[in-house]
Amino acid sequence: MLEEKEKFYYSIGVERERRYTIMIRILLACGIGASTGFMAANMRKIAKQQGLDVSVHAVSKSQVMEYADKIDVLLLGPHFSSEVAKYQNQLNDHGVKVTSIDPDDYAALDGESILETALDLVEE
């Protein structure tokens, strides 16, 4: 999986021990993409503060498959946690990891914790 995405080179900043040779591309999805849009902006802000060069975008659930070959991680809004297995099955062939966002982190717009979740998922 990593080799095919080598053109997205980056290495993680000083605060993290992790090292990657590719950009980690994160997609957040909810009903219409509005609430996850705020979260994506918060995550980009945190990533910039930590010196991380990650890509974070938000879309509606209906648009997810359009991004299948352009993402590494899909984070579903907590209200769609029951659909994680469905999306994981659809995205397995694309090498995408899928989970839902913790409801408490989502409610608090805790971009740092959600960014950590995404990076942990990539390392699994």
Task: Identify the role of each PLM range.
Residues 60-64, 83:
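Short acidic active-site motifs
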